[in-house]
Design a protein with these regions (language model features):
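Conserved RNase H-like, two-metal-ion catalytic cores of nucleic-acid enzymes
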Residues: 1-65
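Metal-dependent phosphoesterase core characteristic of DEDDh/y 3'-5' exonuclease domains
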Residues: 23-42, 66-174
Length: 174
C-alpha cells in the first residue's frame, strides 16, 4: 500500500491500461556478521520483465530460515514485512522464527541525531557510505536492463556493508 509511505504519484508504475502494476522483489543482499562474503541474488532481465521474483524469494527464504537473528535498518517495518508479503503471495510458508535487531529503532530510541537514515548514520560515523541512486534505477531494473540490474546488485552489496558497520557502532547501546 501507499499509506504513510509518501511516494509521489509520479513514481507509481502503471501498465498500458493505466492500472498500477503489482510490486515485486528485484534483489536482496545479506551477510553473516564478521564474514567478508556478501550473499545476494537479483532477478534476471527476463524475470524482471515478467515480474517474476520466485527464484530470488526462494534464495532469501533459505537464508532467513537459517538465521537466528536478522539485522536491518527499518527491517521490522519494511524489509521483513515486504518479504513476508511476497512469501505468502507465492504460497511459501514463513521461514523458521528469528529475532530481529532494527538499527533504525535503536538509533531513534537511544540518540537525538538530526536524521536516522542509514545514509546519514554512515556519514555521521565516517563509515563506508551507501551508493547514490535515483528512482530511474528501479524503473530501468524493472524494464530488464542488465547494466542497471548490475548497478542495483552493487548498491545492495554496499548497503549491507554499511549496515554491518552501523550495527557494530550502535551495538553497545542495544
Amino acid at each position: 500500500g501507499l499509506y504513510k509511505q509518501f511516494i509521489p504519484h509520479t513514481n507509481i508504475i502503471k501498465d498500458e491500461n493505466g492500472e498500477e502494476k503489482s510490486w515485486f522483489c528485484l534483489s536482496w543482499a545479506a551477510k553473516w556478521l564478521y564474514d567478508d562474503t556478501i550473499l545476494s541474488d537479483i532477478v534476471t532481465p527476463d524475470e524482471s520483465m515478467a515480474r517474476n521474483d520466485g527464484r530470488i524469494l526462494k534464495s532469501i527464504w533459505k537464508l532467513l530460515d537459517e538465521a537466528d537473528i536478522v539485522i536491518g535498518h527499518n527491517g521490522d517495518r519494511f524489509d521483513i514485512r515486504k518479504l513476508n508479503a511476497r512469501f505468502i503471495d507465492n504460497e511459501m510458508s514463513p521461514p523458521s522464527p528469528f529475532r530481529t535487531v532494527d538499527t533504525l529503532k535503536v538509533a531513534r530510541r537511544e540518540f537525538a541525531f538530526v536524521s536516522y537514515k542509514q545514509d546519514f548514520l554512515t556519514k555521521h560515523f565516517k563509515l563506508p557510505q551507501k551508493l547514490s541512486t535515483e528512482f530511474q534505477l528501479w524503473v530501468d531494473c524493472m524494464a530488464g536492463d542488465q547494466k542497471r540490474l548490475d548497478e542495483m546488485a552493487e548498491y545492495n552489496r554496499h548497503d549491507v556493508m554499511g549496515l554491518e558497520q552501523v550495527y557494530l557502532k550502535l551495538r553497545p547501546y542495544i
